Amino acid sequence: MEVLMAERADLVFHNKVIDGTAMKRLISRLIDHFGMAYTSHILDQVKTMGFQQATATSISLGIDDLLTIPSKGWLVQDAEQQSLILEKHHHYGNVHAVEKLRQSIEIWYATSEYLRQEMHPNFRMTDPSNPVHIMSFSGARGNASQVHQLVGMRGLMSDPQGQMIDLPIQSNLREGLSLTEYLISCYGARKGVVDTAVRTSDAGYLTRRLVEVVQHIVVRRTDCGTIRGISVSPRNGIGMTEKMLIQTLIGRVLADDIYMGLRCIAARNQDIGVGLVNRFIAFRAQSIYIRTPFICRSTSWICRLCYGRSPTHGDLVELGEAVGIIAGQSIGEPGTQLTLRTFHTGGVFTGGTAEHVRAPFNGKIKFNEDLVHPTRTRHGHPAFLCYIDLYVTIESQDILHNVNIPPKSFLLVQNDQYVESEQVIAEIRARTSTFNFKERVRKHIYSDSEGEMHWSTDVYHAPEYTYGNVHLLPKTSHLWILSGGPRRSSLVPFSLHKDQDQMNIHSLSVEQRESSDLSVTNDRARHKLFSSDPSGKKEGKILDYSGPARIISNGHWNFIYPAILHENSYLLAKRRRNRFIIPFQYDQEREKELMPRSGISIEIPINGILRRNSILAYFDDPRYRRSSSGITKYGTVEVDSIVKKEDLIEYRGAKEFSPKYQMKVDRFFFIPEEVHILPGSSSIMVRNNSIIGVDTRITLNTRSRIGGLVRVERKKKRIELKIFSGDIHFPGEADKISRHSGILIPPGTGKKNSKESKKLQNWIYVQRITPTKKKYFVSVRPVVTYEIADGINLATLFPQDLLQERDNVKFRVVNSILYRNGKPIRGIYYTSIQLVRTCLVLNWDQDRNGSIEKVKASIVEVRANDLIRDFIRIDLVKSPISYTGKRNDMAGSGLIPDNGSDHTNINPFYSKVRRIQSLTQHQGTIRTLLNRNKECQSFLILSSSNCSRIGPFNGSKSHNVTKESIQIKEDPMIPIRNSLGPLGTVPKIANFDSPYYLITHNQILLNKYLLLDNLKQTFQVLKYYLMDENGRIYNPYPCRNIIFHPFDLTWCFLHHDYCEKTSTIIVLGQFICENENVCISKYGPQIKSGQVLIVHVDSLVIRSAKPHLATPGATVHGHYGEILYEGDTLVTFIYEKSRSGDITQGLPKVEQVLEVRSVDSISMNLEKRVEGWNEHIKRILGIPWGFLIGAELTIAQSRISLVNKIQKVYRSQGVQIHNRHIEIIVRQITSKVLVSEDGMSNVFSPGELIGLLRAERTGRSLEEAICYRAILWGITRASLNTQSFISEASFQETARVLAKAALRGRIDWLKGLKENVVLGGMIPVGTGFKGLVHRSRQDNNIPLEIKKKNLFEGEIRDILFHHRELFGSCIPNNFHNTPEQ
């Protein structure tokens, strides 16, 4: 009795609620004290009592018990307010898209967590006996997070890929979800039908493969006699918490005696219990060697001591226990359970979210300022960081409240600041969990409006895309999308150009994505398709002329050039020295009478350079146009080609010639015929040499258009069918016509001896046709005669004073026939063929030094009042200049910068060097125009790409810019690039004292403030040249015309006293962000963000633009100045995020590790290290030892890291799996080695797979070195490479496995469980056969082993300590391995 009393006195008296963890502790202590049987009896009583009480209490759960937390309303409102501010910052361009996503997720996550914490006190205060409250905090299945969804808010969900959906579900399940919320919640729910089915099957399959690998592992012996061990260090080393250490050690068996000084505190082969672990921790033992399944010396089973305690009853595992199957199931089973958990309903960024501390009431904050340091939060907001515990006092009128803020937290308020109730005063940083998987994610940002791209910093070409349009940002900057769509119609829009204003040639062309309305008439396209070259071959390359813009892509830009400008117009000429201008004058009435469809076409080659004898313009006379096929004949007329070979027009690389034949005669003939080209397989309904009428069916779906003689010629793959109209003459003696063949007969020759001797009215063409050898007849075909008029009609086309040019530029008008004599011309149906073309040929006198080889043509538009005129301007280019231009042109496009010849004429003493210098400074033509009433106030518009540079004057004295304007007297080419950095960087609004100037063409200084008239029309802004990083000049997108609609422009009125008040100067072309406090508007400080387009005395016009912030390393897509459409990719961010620790992502991770196929898998890193080790160790220890220890080390390392990886996933889920289960599996997938080719052995052939232990033993017994290297199997491959073919066949690929086994004559010894189950035998496991093992044999072995051990241990440990440094990087430092001798 006394003993009992004494025992009772030792026991602890519990008087509190026992939850799950307390229950676990109680049971384990009961087992320690009383053993299994007694404990189960006690627990039975507890269970019975529990059920009785529950029945008596009769807890029921109704929907009314779900009480929504009252603080939810304002919490959600608060979060919405924060999201709104965030959205605004994103709109201003202060926060980029990824930051916005992160912050919004954090805002909602923090809100949801705070609600969850509020839930418990709320229930405790309002309704402590509420059944929901009792159940949720009972510690039974079900936890706060589910209740939180019922009464708090459902929160953030992740989609099936584990990405966050940044739209939170604000309702809870008690209030009910809206439709959107319901759909989102279906995504994230782990209970979704699809999800559960798919995940469960995955988990099931994982279990099946695991069991397959280890089913044959059974405990067969008590001790295998191994002398190795794995060291675990109880000193709180890296990554080993005390809890993990206890988990690792308890239930294991010691591999070595442990000494504390000279005293042995634990012996070898002793199993470790709680007491022993506590002693180790107290004594801080250096390192503890334990036995694990890894080091067991048996191949296909395991011994009791290496396995350790059985998890079921806490003693050493019994012989005959099927530990393999238990291991497989313990790893696979949690998977199936975890899929069904609504474990973690969102929060990808949980790793870094912070808890908020809120003020309990209104009051003043007090804290010690010496203990905090100013810093910024991770979102860049100012805060205080406290390094140690900080006590914050909040005092209101009658209450004092103390809040303790833990170290490393952020304080978000100032000292002595007044805070309102529930205001966030501090953020407690979450301890970052070490188990989150980081992954790099690319996020594409898409443009949400169409417009023109612009960036405000230099960008680099990504090295792998040197010729593409992928650019890397070197520093944080804004990308701007300037609003304004591309020009969509070819109507001339309201133009901003005034009189004498120069324009670029490319403005007449059309935007790339729209097909052109200026499109070329069909006949023009016809010539291109059928232009023939002198050798008579068909033109190989058919050019596509859907619009006049030809697209040429080269290295850096995609140039689009107008090839032809097709205008119905007259040419009037206006002359200056060395420059020649032809205006096109639109003349509506005359046009209708004279030229219904065709007009003068001007052809300027792509690069704008014309050579000698080039054709500048041509006119297609409608009289020389045919709609049917036929042959042209000149008779015996001599013709010579105008275009000589060396004068070919060069089209970038591809020489393309369409020779024109100049004629010495005034007439030519056209013989019409109808031609059908049919595929070889078609059936023809008419016979060769038969005569048909009009509209006869030739094939199923073609009919003839004329009547006459049919000729059918079969070529290789097609049939050519021609129909000749005209008479047929059979040969008679008296008929002279029939004697001729293939000639033209002029009118006036009569038929003699016929009834009426009739004269021929027209020319005819006689052709002999021979159907058979003896017979022949003659087809007489009508001929159309064309008279070619002399220069009479040419004078009306091209004005006379143009042709009588007194300058050194010469023009002559030439008629040319487009087809050679006798050449058959094919027409495509419903299109016409032009036979003769009138050309304007350009030539010029040689200079004395003969340096002018080519001229540069450009088109100039001048608008006077409401009449717009276009001029062609031809500049004679001196060849050194063009050479410089070419060499400066990086892409080699041959585009010469438009520096015109004006400067050459202004200053005739330019040398070559000077010319190069001016090239780099010249930025192209900038349009300037005087107002009609000739006031001093000029009017100026910025070209859209901000290419005109604005720089301060050199000699300026004035500050009040509005009243003074200075005349420039210096060189107008002031190099401003040096002062302002390369083009494309935008100067910030700064405090410049001097007025600004633009480099203008006519050297009239513009005043800064300009007037915009008639803003309501849509108008067009053109682009000019752009300088790239090397100072070369480009015109990147010559064909783009941007049209603004009125709502793209904002008109800001300035304060009347603006200049005196602020020092800010608004610069033309400057970008303004919406929130930069540019206080200039009358109606308030806000300007919409955009680019300043027009500056006026009292107002500005801003082209609205949307800024996107981009961080360094982001990839920008597209080119500077490119037009982007809605939905185009703008920029790609790369950022790291932590995967949700959700099992949906967890299971694939486990599977990846077990199948050894993860990208960052151990195999990748280890392969390299292993080779290094093998080399070093071989050098130190010689061949046999080297291979042995090299493979040992490899396998030991990879095993440890595999175990750690798998444990990581499960621990992050809160699932406890004992290491030894994982070890058994990992041991199986790392137990094979590959015989390498380094040394030939008599036993194994190279490339053969053998068990590691077998290789070691064979090597020892043969005393010869076997060279092998470690190999990692996945579980599937390991299952298909076991000792038993029956178990392999029952797993996968049955037929293949059985066939191979039969061919090899494999024998199955039926050692495993599965083979016996398949064949219906008894399985070789079960804990009944203790007496079978002879104890004596094992006892004899032990002393011998220990002797051996002492010999080798010292040396080998030294070697391994040396090698620990080698592989220390890939595993935790607390493991190292002692291999066998």
UniProtKB/Swiss-Prot annotation:
Chief location category: plastid
UniProt xrefs under Pfam families: RNA_pol_Rpb1_4, RNA_pol_Rpb1_5
Recorded family membership: Belongs to the RNA polymerase beta' chain family. RpoC2 subfamily.
Function of the protein: DNA-dependent RNA polymerase catalyzes the transcription of DNA into RNA using the four ribonucleoside triphosphates as substrates.
GO BP annotations listed: DNA-templated transcription
Database matches in PANTHER family: DNA-DIRECTED RNA POLYMERASE SUBUNIT BETA
Cofactor (UniProt): Zn(2+)
Subcellular location: Plastid, Chloroplast
E.C. code: 2.7.7.6
Single GO cellular component term: chloroplast
CDD domains, sorted: RNAP_beta'_C
Cofactor binding note: Binds 1 Zn(2+) ion per subunit.
Residues that, per the record, bind Zn(2+): 224, 296, 303, 306
Record's keyword annotation contains Amino-acid biosynthesis: no
Family annotation (InterPro entries): DNA-dir_RpoC2_beta_pp, RNA_pol_beta''_euk, RNA_pol_Rpb1_3_sf, RNA_pol_Rpb1_4, RNA_pol_Rpb1_5, Rpb1_funnel_sf
Keywords: Chloroplast, DNA-directed RNA polymerase, Metal-binding, Nucleotidyltransferase, Plastid, Transcription, Transferase, Zinc
Name of protein: DNA-directed RNA polymerase subunit beta''
Reactions catalysed: RNA(n) + a ribonucleoside 5'-triphosphate = RNA(n+1) + diphosphate
SUBUNIT field: In plastids the minimal PEP RNA polymerase catalytic core is composed of four subunits: alpha, beta, beta', and beta''. When a (nuclear-encoded) sigma factor is associated with the core the holoenzyme is formed, which can initiate transcription.
Top-rank taxon, per record: Eukaryota
Listed GO MF terms: DNA binding; DNA-directed RNA polymerase activity; zinc ion binding
